[in-house]
Amino acid sequence: MISAAQLLDELMGRDRNLAPDEKRSNVRWDHESVCKYYLCGFCPAELFTNTRSDLGPCEKIHDENLRKQYEKSSRFMKVGYERDFLRYLQSLLAEVERRIRRGHARLALSQNQQSSGAAGPTGKNEEKIQVLTDKIDVLLQQIEELGSEGKVEEAQGMMKLVEQLKEERELLRSTTSTIESFAAQEKQMEVCEVCGAFLIVGDAQSRVDDHLMGKQHMGYAKIKATVEELKEKLRKRTEEPDRDERLKKEKQEREEREKEREREREERERKRRREEEEREKERARDRERRKRSRSRSRHSSRTSDRRCSRSRDHKRSRSRDRRRSRSRDRRRSRSHDRSERKHRSRSRDRRRSKSRDRKSYKHRSKSRDREQDRKSKEKEKKGSDDKKSSVKSSSREKQSEDTNPESKESDTKNEVNGTSEDIKSEGDTQSN
């Protein structure tokens, strides 16, 4: 009844007898009523039903859904069910191994008994047969002697005795052959190395196939394969923590190396920043020094420019006054000369006036060119003063001061040239 109920539970579920409105029982895979061997793969009690190795019915729950839940859970192969299952299967294999050893021992013992038992009776029968043969030969000789002597009745009695001895000898020979045939049949047995059952050597193939496809043989074969598979899984499972620990250590070492490299990188970056800040400060100081030197040079150049411009303006005003006075004098002299020289021809006056105009134009153009050259030189000197350092500013001032006398000389020369030209022009007019 229990096995039938379990079969119905597997087919229809444990709540098969509940009404639709009744509450169903929700059993977890870790409940005590659940077969842990079934969760790990199969229940060994289901393998050997109605066989010599029957383990009896399993009273716990066998549910495929619970096994799937266990396989999907985070505690899969971590609770210890697989190790218990492996120990139970190994105990079953140890039992069948003992059975196989006992079978081999029985075969060896029976073979020894057969060999010793067959040798003993056979030897005794041979001896009896040999004794009977000797007696028969002796009796036959006696019968011949009695027949030659004419003792027929005695010879016939001995002949009957010889017949009895021959029958006894044949009986002994037949028993010996029977024992040998039985011994030969006993030697053809062997033990199955999987389930421990006795097999006949050279038996029909159908009977061999029936044995290989039987529950007992297939059950123990499945147990052996499952044991090897579980050993491999558990070995890998035990190696995984070691590997995880090793990988964790390697990861920690890598992180430490990365942190060390990061610290070194940050140290180099800080050092580089400090050096950059120092260089920037040095550049700022250099710029400040250059600005100061430029300001000093600009101040000195401006003062020198002011002095030069003042001297130039003074000279220009003086030269302008001189030119104005000369021009007035010339106009006066010309008007006087015109009044005095009315008799001269107008053409000659025109030519002379043209020559004077040309000379005055040339003089003005030369003075204009000299003024432009002087301005360009001053601009070049200002640019060079801005580029040079403050140390050379004093030398530039000296050079600018040295150049002032030259300009004065040039101005004086121009003035002298102008006066000389004016004098020449007046002389020409007077000579005319």
Swiss-Prot record:
The modification N-acetylmethionine is found at M1. It is found in: Nucleus speckle. InterPro entries: Luc7-rel. Residues 124-181 form a coiled coil. The modification N6-acetyllysine is found at K231. Binds cAMP regulatory element DNA sequence. May play a role in RNA splicing. May interact with SFRS1 and form homodimers. Interacts with JMJD6. Interacts with RBM25. Interacts with RSRC1 (via Arg/Ser-rich domain). Interacts with RRP1B. This is Luc7-like protein 3. It comes from Mus musculus (Mouse). The lineage of its organism: Eukaryota, Metazoa, Chordata, Craniata, Vertebrata.
